[in-house]
Every structure is written in C-alpha cells, then in structure tokens.
Amino acid sequence: MPDYINFHSRNFLIRKFISLVIKILVFFPDWLFCLVWNLILLMINNSVRISLIKDGRFLVKDKIQSMEIVHKKRFEFYLQNISTRLNHISYEYMLDSVKFSPGDTIIDCGANIGELYLAIDQNYQAEFKYYGFEPAPKEFSALNNNTRNLVEKPLALSSNTENRNFYIRTKTADSSFEEGKNQKKIHVECMTIDDYFKEIKSITLLKL
C-alpha cells in the first residue's frame, strides 16, 4: 500500500485488511469492484467513491472533486482523497521548485490521465497554457475529460514526425514505444516538439 494513504482509522488490522482487499478486488468484474469498494469505504467512514463509466474507465469522487481514471488497479492511489494524490504528484515532480507565472507554457509528454495538469491547477492556481500528449485511446479520453477538453487529439512526441508502433500497459501506466510483456500494440501519430510548437518561444515546464 502506498505510504501516503492514510485512512481515517490508524488501526493496524484495518490497514492490513485494506491492503489485502486492494490485491484481491482487482480481479473482480468492474461493476462488482466498484460496489464492494464503495461498501468498504462507507463502513470505514471514507468519503471516496468509485463508479464505472465504461470500457475500463472509472469516475472517482470525494466530497470536493471528481476525476476520471483508467484501470481499477490505479484506484488505490485515491483512497484517501483526490487532493492527497495530487499533492503527492506535486511532490514527485518537485513542482514547488518551479516559479509559475500567468501565461506559462506547460508541456506534458506522456500525460496519461492528466494528473500533472490537475496538480498544478489545484496547488498553484496559475493561469497557464497546457499541452498534454497521450496516444493511448482510453488514457486520452480520461485526459481530455480531466483537463476540460484542452487536448485536441491523441498524439505522441518523438524524435521524428512519423507513425510508429506504441505498446500500451494501462495497469501500470508505463506504456511506451518499447515492446514488453502483456502489452497491447497500436499505431500512433508522432511529432517532434519543434514541429508541433513552431511559434512557442518559451516553455516553463517540460515533463517527459
């Protein structure tokens, strides 16, 4: 269990139980996964809820906000609340070291579901121009919904402008151009940063 998940109760047995549940429930059908998790979270007085959208996409809600995620294995990162997860993203990417100003340009290569965008939007409240690149179809759909349709189309950044094979592994969010085990192959459009951003003179943050 990620160490930043801190349930309302610190009881050791409850934490061990939740850890076991996380490992077991991912094998349940999507609808049953949501039902059982919501019952458990209700019993431990946790406000987080999860519902199935379709095709392996889920909506996570807490008392304050909601966001779309892909693959139920990723739900464990939101078990305290969405804000805590986004704070962890800010810490992982050391966003406190970036001086954000109005009009900044942020490029998110491999944006997945848009957690970087949401973390900056939540913690820094700066007006910025966001460009997210995500070629995987399900992740792109969630990205587009989470960023309020800021991303125009599924696209990958690469060293050449071309079409390439792309290997998806949604469960662990480590899809790439390199073929690996248990990955789905798709064909994606790729562009270089120079080709895509011909008129942009300054980039505040580039996440690769």
Predicted segment positions?
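Short, surface-exposed acidic/glycine-rich loop or hinge patches that mediate macromolecular interfaces
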Residues: A111, L157-S158, L208
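Short SAM/SAH-binding signature in class I
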Residues: S202-K207
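Glycine-rich adenosyl-binding loop in Rossmann-like folds that engage adenosine-containing cofactors
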Residues: Q65-L95, K153-K201
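S-adenosyl-L-methionine
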Residues: M1-F133, K138-N145, K198
